[in-house]
Amino acid sequence: YIISEEPITFTIGKEGELTQTNMEKDSTGNIVVKNYRPDLDKKVYNDAAIDSDNNGYVEGSDYSVGDMVPYQITVKIPQNIEKLKKFIVTDTPENLEDDTATIKIAVKDGDAVAETVYTLTKDSNGFEIEFKPAQMSEYNGKTLIISYKAKLLDTAKKTTEGNKNNATLTYTNKIDETGVGKEG
């Protein structure tokens, strides 16, 4: 979770009830504390899985060596993204070669994300997208969709074990005076 440094102020009435606060409160007077945990999910395309609940992206699918396999990473952007110091999506495939030329980053049901708010770096084992949190306030609370293709290599496992293609999210989850924070 990403913890905010915003102080919670409140006043207690004579009867012990919460009378005033700078935070949202529910109908019983309890303060609703917001912790923003950015979620990341990664799926592979399977045209046989298209239905009203999804767009064909599922947990697993069958492909042949040489196929260009479509992947989709979804990332929920925290409400306080601009306060973070680090927000990085890393993809590390196994027996696949990411085609970074096919990477598209967009807001769910919306426009492409400005290329000025991230840096894409390809390495020998996948890619890294380093977002610039201070420039991302317009994406607060939105879901980003990162779509791309990866070629299934001839070194691929041809068993039911499959070939892993992991994505991770690295972010600062404690904003402190030094600006270093703690990675989550």
Identify the residue ranges that each predicted region occupies.
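Surface-exposed loop/edge segments in extracytoplasmic proteins
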Residues: 99-100, 111-117, 178-180
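Solvent-exposed beta-hairpin/edge-strand motifs
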Residues: 90-111
